[in-house]
UniProtKB/Swiss-Prot annotation:
This protein binds specifically to 23S rRNA; its binding is stimulated by other ribosomal proteins, e.g. L4, L17, and L20. It is important during the early stages of 50S assembly. It makes multiple contacts with different domains of the 23S rRNA in the assembled 50S subunit and ribosome. The keyword Nucleus does not apply. Pfam families: Ribosomal_L22. This is Large ribosomal subunit protein uL22. It comes from Shewanella sediminis (strain HAW-EB3). Gene3D superfamilies: Ribosomal protein L22/L17 (3.90.470.10). Keywords: Ribonucleoprotein, Ribosomal protein, RNA-binding, rRNA-binding. NCBIfam families: rplV_bact (TIGR01044).
Length: 110
């Protein structure tokens, strides 16, 4: 049994979010939640929210036992980028790219 939860258009770069995702991939959900709770990174808060949602989906929709769940897969895909302009000296302008992520967490009982 596999249950997933998604957070699309998360306002963090995929590169930063993958650092957090790599730490919890394949772990039991209790251990993963513990790691995310004490992580100082902003992306950890976003990933923890999605993991909590996946656990709730498994419990409510499938009747799964929380103690047996593991983080089966966690994928961080690149979302659309927002282009912004930063004024610079002598009438020039630089482009700022604000990146977004699509966070997908799959929990399974295997």
């Amino acid at each position: 049994m596999e249950v997933l939860a998604k957070h699309r258009f998360a306002r963090t770069s995929p590169q930063k979010c993958r650092l957090v995702a790599d730490q919890i991939r394949g772990l039991p959900v209790a251990k993963a939640l513990e790691i995310l709770t004490f992580s100082p990174k902003k992306a950890a808060v976003l990933v923890k929210k999605v993991l909590d949602s996946a656990i709730a989906n498994a419990e409510h929709n499938e009747g799964a036992d929380i103690d047996e769940l593991r983080v089966g897969a966690i994928m961080i895909d690149e979302g659309p980028t927002m282009k912004r302009i930063m004024p610079r000296a002598k009438g020039r302008a630089d482009r700022i790219i604000k990146r977004t992520s699509h966070i997908t967490v799959v929990v399974s009982d295997r």
